[in-house]
Amino acid sequence: GLLGGLLGPLLGGGGGGGGGLL
């Protein structure tokens, strides 16, 4: 998600450096 970098790699998917499931 777009909030990956803010919420973390577990919650975001490719957002702001986050690569999680959502």
Swiss-Prot record:
Compartments where located: Secreted
Disordered: annotated segments: 1-22
Secreted: present as a keyword of the record? yes
Question: Which keywords accompany this UniProt record?
Answer: Amphibian defense peptide, Antibiotic, Antimicrobial, Secreted
Looking at the UniProt record for this protein, which Gene Ontology cellular component terms does it annotate, in alphabetical order? extracellular region
Q: Which GO terms describe its biological process?
A: defense response to bacterium
Domain of life, per UniProt, equals Eukaryota
- The residues that cross the membrane are none
**Could you tell me what this protein is called?**
Leptoglycin
